Amino acid sequence: VELNLVIFNLGDSMYDAFEKTKEDNGAIYNKLENSYLQHKRQFTLFKRFEKESLFTLYMLNEGISRLKFKDPSRGNGTMQFLKAFADLGTKAALGEDSKSCLNVISGHTVLTCDDEVVPFVNGTHLIISLNSQKNNKDLPDSQYLKYYSRYIPGTFIDCKIYITDNFVENI
């Protein structure tokens, strides 16, 4: 059985909302800006990313929130959701040909996760790098992070998980 779930919020994209709070959220914003500058040095003629797309990726990581200046406990929910998806998707795919998939679509960015790129622990936080090295210092693989000319207002998270016999047995 194929299970499809969509969560959406219309309005500002993740990036646009984060940009609006950069003055109040200076420490977090500077952290993301520094990550972007490190990644930008790795750009080549054939592999480069828009700032919006990389910031969207960074914002998914645990401990990052556009509203952290208001509430220090924020910045965990989305990564916990991605981790739960990865765990469920792995259980579903054991011994099966079905492949679970999750997309985060926000603004111009489409970020895709599957069983090849899942959240992992880095220090005390869960992060996602979208690369096979599982290293947030390296650029993401371009098949998992894309920039589209069409703008999507808000954020959509859609996931597809297959409910299989293996899934039921491994819960």
Predicted feature descriptions by range:
Residues 16-171:
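Flexible, glycine-/charge-rich segments associated with ATP-binding catalytic modules
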Residues 1-3, 98:
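Short, well-ordered loop/turn elements at secondary-structure boundaries
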Residues 8-14:
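Glycine-rich acidic phosphate-binding loop
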